[in-house]
């Protein structure tokens, strides 16, 4: 079989913004591999593409590092939190609570007791994805500000596991139960801020138009004098060559037409929010890993790197594709002929493979020939990379680095094994020793 050609310099994925090969290699040498790197200018450029919306509300679950959150806040971006921990992250990053512009909104499909106490204490608006949330908030704090997140009966997503609407999605209040939810709002005197619909459409503008029409229909059915609507998130990112780039102006214009229709009916301004996550940060981030082994296995050729799905979960969970490039230890690109390669990690887990499709089938991809010590760069990993990482196989969390113009700074140091073990070694109730079995 003839080896495929390596991508030309024009086809080779580019590092984001001010990040180049030598800077990446220098960061890897200083902080070790694997590590995450983000480019601040790329994030700012993505924010600017959405400035026509009244409120950009960052879905911090995409990348919740405090330094990224501070960057968002400095750019005037508001934040969405989906857990008590994310509320505390937003506060630690300098977000305030209160005010008409609602810097922090809490979105979920349930409220545990601790989080309920915290949102009530802080007065954070709750975007409710179940009727029980409305009832629980109302009992704890009559008059509390709320949104209603509606599941309109259809959905969209790049994977079945990311579909956020329809009867197979847990998210949102089923559209046929809107009246029941409004009755709870009335019973507890809750302050209904607006309606939220997180469906996403990517570049399917016909689908997006249907989503916008459904929002107008739901507001009419509600018959309430709301102050805002939220378009949710779901803006697509071109992960692979040939993926179309989303037209953010067209996206806004479709939503703005829906908003203007509501303004004419309600007789006052209606705030239009959007809730992007990966759109803002995916293209700004890369994961750099070192080649540690390579071997033929039957008809496949494996290159093994020191990052695993504990670091980058998306390929194993969704079958997601991330473009890769290869640099030598000094940061120069490898430009040799490509070879069909299976890229895999160090975990004691058969599914620890980066080149697989949804369902788990291994799919070799053309990769320039590598040497042990080279750096493999996984592109467009700024979203749902570090924030979804784990300590599986007792592997500590890895560093994060932010490149901002000429400055390169560490924004999360590498976790130590001692820190990983600490919660299990802290003083607690003494355990009665169990007798050892006689090995004979």
UniProtKB/Swiss-Prot annotation:
Its EC number is 4.1.1.20. Keywords: Amino-acid biosynthesis, Decarboxylase, Lyase, Lysine biosynthesis, Pyridoxal phosphate. The keyword DNA repair does not apply. The active site is at 348 (proton donor). Substrate binds at residues 278, 314, 318, 349, 384. Residues 421-440 are annotated as: Disordered. One of its GO terms (molecular function) is pyridoxal phosphate binding. Residues 421-431 have a biased composition (Low complexity). It catalyses: meso-2,6-diaminopimelate + H(+) = L-lysine + CO2. GO terms for biological process: lysine biosynthetic process via diaminopimelate. Pyridoxal 5'-phosphate binds at residues 234, 275-278, 384. Its cofactor is pyridoxal 5'-phosphate. Pathway: Amino-acid biosynthesis; L-lysine biosynthesis via DAP pathway; L-lysine from DL-2,6-diaminopimelate: step 1/1. The modification N6-(pyridoxal phosphate)lysine is found at residue 61. Pfam families: Orn_Arg_deC_N, Orn_DAP_Arg_deC. NCBIfam families: lysA. Specifically catalyzes the decarboxylation of meso-diaminopimelate (meso-DAP) to L-lysine. Homodimer. Belongs to the Orn/Lys/Arg decarboxylase class-II family. LysA subfamily. This is Diaminopimelate decarboxylase. It comes from Streptomyces coelicolor (strain ATCC BAA-471 / A3(2) / M145). The gene is lysA.
